[in-house]
Amino acid sequence: MNGSMTPTAPEVALANVVVDIERGAARAGWDQAPTLYALVPTARLLGDPLLPDEVAAHLRSGWDGSDDHLSAVVQEDMADDDLEAVLGHLAWPPEVAGAALTVERVVVPPEVEAQAPEDPEAAIEFVSNHPSRTEVRLAVGVLRSGESWCALRMRPFDSDDKVGQGSNLVPALVDALRASLEPVADEQA
């Protein structure tokens, strides 16, 4: 957040769309592939004369009427191999105000992570089979203007009222998404 106790309109809009994305992922269930979203101002989408009527009606039903309100536009499913590297190669058109993604991960307590083998494949096997492992779903969003928001749902506590939220819960994914929004060298010239 912005450092003050009162969030800005873009921060509220981002938090709302990230929570909506996470709840949509929850309705789809667990064991889903990562999904990438373009975050676009809803007013911009509604101003598109080529927007189908049924899509416009759906957008209007969730729109708060503000210029800050964001809609999540699903992109192609992503490979889960090296998500941060894939994000580093993305480029978004200027109409996109931000980006978001959902991804599922297995996490373990820090003391268990410290015991993991150094070999990456052996470490994955170790963590995936450890009795202290927990499956989580992350929804992470960032705006070009710098704001970020994350929502984290743990599989053992799979309920909307148990979703953790914060501006930087997953720093590596926040940074990778933010980098995908950086202007391409040709755009800077």
Q: Language-model features: where?
A:
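Short N-terminal edge-element motif at the start of the domain
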Residues: 1-23, 27-30
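Glycine-rich, aromatic-bearing surface loops/beta-hairpins
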Residues: 110-189
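N-terminal interaction modules that seed assembly of large macromolecular complexes
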Residues: 22-76
